[in-house]
């Protein structure tokens, strides 16, 4: 038999991967917290198998979600005060060798935006969408470093994309 805190620590080992750290164990519960901004992923099938073991649980954010440094990713706990070690061994076997959770850092750092449309290009209407795109990019740690206006002319748009690619931005967005 194991105390709930020891059991929670074993569950943490099942789930934790790099780019995250644990909270202190308290009353049989540990939380995992993101160390970086990135994409949070959960092996949902193996998590289901682990959670099928009685008297333990691991709750996570949804898989494939953007997270920020400091966000809580998961909480795990042993439900009774003491737990049969065989249940934790069963959970460890269900989890396999790889951790259940992963935070992958964002790889894209810079973006260029090409705003298309003859009305915007000629100044007949104001471009109100580019600031929205820029804010959305910033939420993922991506800086918009280039912005180009193009008419609806296909050759002009094609040339703008080629120029943007040559400039070395990580991401090109056409609106």
Segments the model singles out, each with a brief description of its role:
Residues 92, 97-152, 156:
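Glycine-rich phosphate/diphosphate-binding loop of Rossmann-like nucleotide-binding domains
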Residues 9-12, 134, 161:
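Short glycine-/small-residue-rich flexible loop motifs, especially phosphate/cofactor-binding loops
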Residues 33-35, 76, 114-116, 174-175:
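Short beta-strand segments
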Residues 2-106:
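Extended, charged alpha/beta regions that create polyanion-binding interfaces
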Residues 63-65, 71-79, 116, 147-159:
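Noncatalytic linker/hinge segments flanking ATPase motor cores
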Residues 156-175:
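Glycine-rich phosphate-binding loop
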